[in-house]
Each structure stands twice: as C-alpha cells, then as structure tokens.
Amino acid sequence: MATGQKLMRAVRVFEFGGPEVLKLRSDIAVPIPKDHQVLIKVHACGVNPVETYIRSGTYSRKPLLPYTPGSDVAGVIEAVGDNASAFKKGDRVFTSSTISGGYAEYALAADHTVYKLPEKLDFKQGAAIGIPYFTAYRALIHSACVKAGESVLVHGASGGVGLAACQIARAYGLKILGTAGTEEGQKIVLQNGAHEVFNHREVNYIDKIKKYVGEKGIDIIIEMLANVNLSKDLSLLSHGGRVIVVGSRGTIEINPRDTMAKESSIIGVTLFSSTKEEFQQYAAALQAGMEIGWLKPVIGSQYPLEKVAEAHENIIHGSGATGKMILLL
C-alpha cells in the first residue's frame, strides 16, 4: 500500500463458507480509478441472494479470494478516471456491477455499469435497482418476450426481483398474479402492480391459482425457487407458455411430457450473460420508468455494515420478504 493512501471499512471474504466468513475490516485501501472507471462513495448497497451463493462457493462464478461482495451500490462520485467523461465528482449514481465490491465505504466501477440516479429516488432506492430490476427486465422482455395482454405469475413477488417484475409487467400491459408468504408481503405486491395475490404458504394455493385463471392457464411464470415449484408451474401454463427460471436452490424431478402437449418452454436466466449493448437497453427502459414514475423500489430490511452476516442469514432463511434488503453506510 502506498504511503498515505486513504483507508476504508469494507467486508472481506477470505474463504468460502457460511455467513460467518464475512469479515468487516477497517484497513482496506480506497481504490484509485483507472481508465474508464469511477470511484463511488457508497451510501447504500443492495443485498442479493446470489451474493450468498457466491460467498458459499457453490455458485458457477467464483471470485478470487479475498474479495468484497456486492454489485448494487448507490452513492456519489468521489473520483473519475481517464476517459470517464460522462461523470463528474458529486454526481448521484447507482450501479449494476462493481469492480472492487459494494459492501464497502467506497466502490470502484467501470463507467458503463454506472447510471445517473434521479433526484426523486433516494440512495436506498438507488441501491435496490441494479440486479433486481435488470434481472426482472431481462426475464420478462428479453427471455419471455412478453406481449401486452398476456398473463404472468410472479413467484416470491414481495422480494426485490419480484416487485421489480410486477412493476415492469404492469407498465408493459400484462395481467399480473403474484405470490407472497406473509400478509404484509401480499399487501405490498398488490400495491406494486399485481392484480391478484396468493399466499404460497397455503397448501392449496396452486389449486386457487388454477381456479382463478381457468382452462387457459398462465402465459409466463417468473420462477424464483424452481427446485420447489417447477413441476407445479408446468401444470399452470397456457399453450405456448414459458417458465422463466430466475432462481433455484437445488434439484427437482419433472415429467418432460408436461411440456409436450402445451408446447411450453423452460428458460433459464442469468443477468450476467447480458451483453454490454443489452445492459444499455435495459438501462434506457428503466431510466424511463424512473422518470415517468412506475419504477419505484420498495425497501425492506435495512442493516448496518456491521450486521452483514445477519443480512446474509435472513435473506435466505427469513420469514418472508417485504421489499429489497439493503446495507446502509
């Protein structure tokens, strides 16, 4: 470390494992932006389920150790590297990715992954945009190729990606059904675009959905927990319907015949398969949503950096989401 280089607090992971491997350090050097990079003073950072999978070492993408988790930061530009002329010190921004990690007081990001944060949204809301909204947009528009008038079922609709999917789907003219496991979660889902909501903790909730949609079935299902729901999803689909798998935490047995009569599809989605051009498309659509007002992130649990392990525990094992989980700095 260079003499006199500024230090910051940051969460570091030195080995893969449970939430206990998240270590808060106060001796981490503040990064210096290089060509096409910016340094952001972080005010808030979103916590996403994928970050727990990466931390555990079970995800397809394994960072080099040690590393700092976190992609979705919101804050203020602190410094700008060469050729990052779209930004200046003091700009309010949010990110869809970081280079140095977001669970920190400062984060380094490539300029093409940084976006202006409108004044009407606060930093907590800014930290809730990145992975949730970009993933929901990719799932609905890019992968499902939704058309106005189609129906969509959003499983786990009260979480960050779920609420984003509800807001986007409503803006694009879809009929939206959502599921949530708590009364508060169901209320939030209805407030954010869903036409009807079902309690997925009820044993017969699938039967209730079937009764509600009738023989036609559902055109699109946004699936957050495929290892639990995929087989049931196939029974709910319309002819030509598609299940978009956004999340899964294990394996499941399905009958491929269930896809044949309806000529239905199962499509997996991962945000980071998107090209740079696709990210720019998503950003343009979402920026319009912020300006018009249909994109309005709902904030759920909030934690200080010191309680990051608790946040990781609760995002997987909590009683039910009611908005986007964030870390406050």
UniProtKB/Swiss-Prot annotation:
NADP(+) binds at residues 53, 158-161, 181, 200, 229, 246-249, 269-271. Signal peptide: none annotated. It is an enzyme of class 1 (oxidoreductase). The keyword Membrane does not apply. The modification Phosphoserine is found at S248. The modification N6-succinyllysine is found at K296. It catalyses: 2 a quinone + NADPH + H(+) = 2 a 1,4-benzosemiquinone + NADP(+). PROSITE patterns: QOR_ZETA_CRYSTAL. Gene3D superfamilies: Medium-chain alcohol dehydrogenases, catalytic domain, NAD(P)-binding Rossmann-like Domain. CDD domains: zeta_crystallin (cd08253). Only very low amounts in the lens. This is Quinone oxidoreductase.
